[in-house]
Amino acid sequence: MAAREQANSVRRSGFFNPFIGKRPFFRPGSGQTAETERPRPPQHSYCTEVGSFKFIAPRCLDEEAPADQRRGVHVGTLERPPKVYCDGSEYDVLNFASGGCWPRRIRVWNGQDFRGDGFNPRFERFHVYDIVETSESASHDDPSRFAELSRPSGSVVTLLGMSECGKRVAVHVYGVRHYFYMAKAEVDSACGITTEAELVRAMVDCAHSSALSAALGNGNGGKQSGGSGGGWWGGKHVSADCFKVETVCHTTLYYFGSKPALYYRVSASSSRLGGFICDNFHPEITKFEGSVDVTTRLLLDNENFTSFGWYRLRPGTHGERVQLRPVERHVTSSDVEINCTPDNLEPIPDEAAWPDYKLMCFDIECKAGTGNEMAFPVATNQEDLVIQISCLLYSLATQNHEHTLLFSLGSCDISEEYSFACVQRGEPRPTVLEFDSEYELLVAFLTFLKQYSPEFATGYNIVNFDWAYIVNKVTSVYNIKLDGYGKFNKGGLFKVWDIATNHFQKKSKVKINGLISLDMYSVATEKLKLPSYKLDAVVGDVLGEHKIDLPYKEIPSYYAGGPDRRGVIGEYCIQDSRLVGKLFFKYLPHLELSAVAKLARITLTRVIFDGQQIRVYTCLLKLARERNFILPDNRRRFDSQADAASETSELAMDSQSHAFDSTDEPDGVDGTPDAAGSGATSENGGGKPGVGRAVGYQGAKVLDPVSGFHVDPVVVFDFASLYPSIIQAHNLCFTTLALDEVDLAGLQPSVNYSTFEVGDQKLFFVHAHIRESLLGILLRDWLAMRKAVRARIPTSTPEEAVLLDKQQSAIKVICNSVYGFTGVANGLLPCLRIAATVTTIGRDMLLKTRDYVHSRWATRELLEDNFPGAIGFRNHKPYSVRVIYGDTDSVFIKFVGLTYEGVSELGDAMSRQISADLFRAPIKLECEKTFQRLLLITKKKYIGVINGGKMLMKGVDLVRKNNCSFINLYARHLVDLLLYDEDVATAAAKVTDVPPAEWVGRPLPSGFDKFGRVLVEAYNRITAPNLDVREFVMTAELSRSPESYTNKRLPHLTVYFKLAMRNEELPSVKERIPYVIVAQTEAAEREAGVVNSMRGTAQNPVVTKTARPQPKRKLLVSDLAEDPTYVSENDVPLNTDYYFSHLLGTISVTFKALFGNDVRTTENLLKRFIPETPHKTPTKTQALLERAGFEKLTPFTPEEESRRILHTVFCTLEAAPHQS
């Protein structure tokens, strides 16, 4: 490695490599260690002493070696501590006392106290950002109250955060017990017991049983989410003191018919033991709430406790004091650690400020080693190396950019121009850290991560790539344990879950104790609708900036080109992190997510990675506890796997209303299919298996649209918060649902309960004065909270307003999760009957609204009786009113005979009248908008113009991000003509009023000539030479690993395999893959054959008996997909026929509403505008014709050709003349 000498600033003569040169104290190979005696087992698992390590470095860094010896990598063993070179100095990576060359916040390292003599550990107020659950075993000679609470083993909940005075703190909370419930009658019958003491003995016997004891000793059956403060003991050490059993009276959550009953409340000293007993003690007995972890118990069982916010330390109930942990007993990298119990904590719910947490924005660059350096690197290949890591460090409190670090394998010189530009922007100069080997680089990065200990980390696609690559590399190649590199020093969670390995996951997950990972790629895909989510496209759209791109294929040559060229890679790497940092502070995702965490009382990591279900579950669990209900246990444990299983169903529910968009269905009200599938499932989540659903679940309902182009005003009424308001208005809940009228004895229909026909079953829900809905209470409180928060925004400071806006947005997200929570068959607490009832009520509301409008406002006189102001809004047309569409929570009403201004003005009064006359509070209609012109295509597909000329569209191809810009441009141009051009709009209205078949034999209205000119322009443009490939790029998401696709003949998969065939950089899962469709050439056919062989879709040639040559087989469009970069670099011709056909197909689907939704007729009529391809007479034939006296025809000019086409379209004879 080259580095700058401290004495004379002269570059070091060469990269140090143990395989080509000797230096003092460095010797390749393995040998004796420096240790002479066995040290005391460390209380940490992060590296503090390394005497030898696996040395892997690229040969291209051997700058003085011949060119033919600079390919591949060196692999061996090096005996010396890991080193880093910075600004001409050499440092021991693991020597904390030497000062180091990166910023450090940690003050306790390797059991030694570096806090200084004047350090004062005292604090009172502290902020919590993460919570970790651990198990701890107390020694027998420890007399403290905390030892008593964890003997022989107990759960400890550690609150990680920062004190008001800026100390990094870890507060260990003891005495939080895991507990669950079992019905006393069921347990007594199964075990032949009658008392609590007998139950304790039975559970101890269960733990002592030979087979189960071994499992308990191995940690099966319990939850371990953080570090460990002590060793684990086997089942043989379980005693009666480990359990506490009480007999309590509760009611199960499911169904109104459930009565209060006696339950055993079984609590255990640790979640591992409690989980083991819950799973293994008489599995046939139904358990309640056994999957709830002790972190959730701490937050829910104590008033106002929060997962993210401020606390104050105080004396306990009986004056007990907190205990300061000595440095030698620290289990985290915090400055101060204390022991306490829940009563030592006082939450401060109204404090919204954040302490000075730190954000690390990082990016890694990798390079393939042996073989083809152009291949994309794989972490488990030891030769595929991490060559650079950029780390930009920010303060979340001030948003200041405080440090820039670049970890580089080999020497790296950042240009002075780049450093000066950083200073000019007010950013720190980059600090370059140079390493001899990849091991040293990675150990240094992990050590920096430990010593700087940022609370938050971000980057772009770090979950799918950067974190995953680092974790796989250090564990598989270097066998480094990562459990000590989070906040905990040992036994902490540091794990990546790859989406490709879990069928249920929608996205990969990263969970690192004490470090919250916020991936800006996920934020961008959720907040933006773009055809590409490459970083350059996102920052271009959001920030108006563009990154300087360095193609992956150029990295090897730059890397081998010396320190200056490696500096270019470094600048590129830093640039990516810098742009992501700007995106982070643009969207501030930590504010919204932390607001969700506070409201749902779950950790930030769970908010980010564990789906919607858990958010509602914890809130319901807390309210149920206050109302003396208990929740049945789910068959899965209460962890990320439970939510992962429900994510797929949540996705299905989100998309269910689009299922029949492209099909023709009968008139009237129709619905979508069963969103949860047809398999049997148990609604009580923990009841007896095999109990199937008794009700078919149908999704959102719609009133069929009156397709066409509407030039009269169309007012749109929306139901405000439809599903939450239905749940509130009709008191829907697990606890208010009755399945049999027997359970309603003594109650009067309509007065005390409502009956709903759902499918072929009657469902009954009691009214609120009989039993109030728990879901309704949650929604009411949340919506009131949101209203109060929004009311504070106008009078708040700008900083407070941002926080409040994120808070109200978080409340909205959770409110909208309630309906989906009940409707997921394999969720945490399913009740499909509630979800089915909600959609049934929504359907009835649409029908009632339609009937009300058609009867109450049927004539002009009736309308003016209801709204006298309507008299002044008459126009020349005869009056009529009609509901032309109903879409789940919206109603479209067309008024003829009223002005647009009048309908707009009357809209609010009309919606209030319908709400008052038809619906219970809080259900209400609101006037959302009024269309001046509306092209209503099919369900959930329309385009229109509202007041002020603003265009609104939904569901049409024009706004789909997978279309290319060429198609979007011309399709949008045609839509603009339809909506904004009076001539075209008038012509379109005439077309709509005539049966579509008639237009086949008659001319289109003359206003359509402008349509024709646009189509001719598009045709001429696509048939012209020198097309810009960028205008024809389409994209599709790689939703899962390619081998997981059933149908592999998809365009973006074809491009994926072509990239693999050419050893290009491969897209990650969830990334959008760009592609174009190319012409079918011989080269395209050859590559299609290779790709089909790679993905196992090759077709066997057809064998015929004759030797006759077979006709050329036309390839599928998917086989003709190609990488746009490859097309540009190699001048591959585009498939212009495909693109123009695609344009025709797109606009035909959009404008089919003009022609009775007949796509074929629409396309045939539009094809009238397309010029015929002229037939070229062969030269020889032309000469013969000329000699015979025929005149040579000259081709038409484009203008003349367009004139003739339009004349043909608009002057078509209605009948052909008869020949004489």
UniProtKB/Swiss-Prot annotation:
Keywords: DNA replication, DNA-binding, DNA-directed DNA polymerase, Endonuclease, Host nucleus, Hydrolase, Multifunctional enzyme, Nuclease, Nucleotidyltransferase, Transferase, Viral DNA replication. One of its GO terms (molecular function) is nucleotide binding. It comes from the Viruses. It catalyses: DNA(n) + a 2'-deoxyribonucleoside 5'-triphosphate = DNA(n+1) + diphosphate; Endonucleolytic cleavage to 5'-phosphomonoester. One of its GO terms (cellular component) is host cell nucleus. Replicates viral genomic DNA. The replication complex is composed of six viral proteins: the DNA polymerase, processivity factor, primase, primase-associated factor, helicase, and ssDNA-binding protein. Additionally, the polymerase contains an intrinsic ribonuclease H (RNase H) activity that specifically degrades RNA/DNA heteroduplexes or duplex DNA substrates in the 5' to 3' direction. Therefore, it can catalyze the excision of the RNA primers that initiate the synthesis of Okazaki fragments at a replication fork during viral DNA replication. This is DNA polymerase catalytic subunit. Its EC number is 2.7.7.7, 3.1.26.4. It comes from Equine herpesvirus 1 (strain V592). GO terms for biological process: DNA-templated DNA replication; viral DNA genome replication. It is found in: Host nucleus. Residues 646-660 have a biased composition (Polar residues). InterPro entries: DNA-dir_DNA_pol_B, DNA-dir_DNA_pol_B_CS, DNA-dir_DNA_pol_B_exonuc, DNA-dir_DNA_pol_B_multi_dom, DNA/RNA_pol_sf, DNA_pol_B_thumb, DNA_pol_palm_dom_sf, DNA_pol_type-B. Its main location: host cell. The lineage of its organism: Viruses, Duplodnaviria, Heunggongvirae, Peploviricota, Herviviricetes.
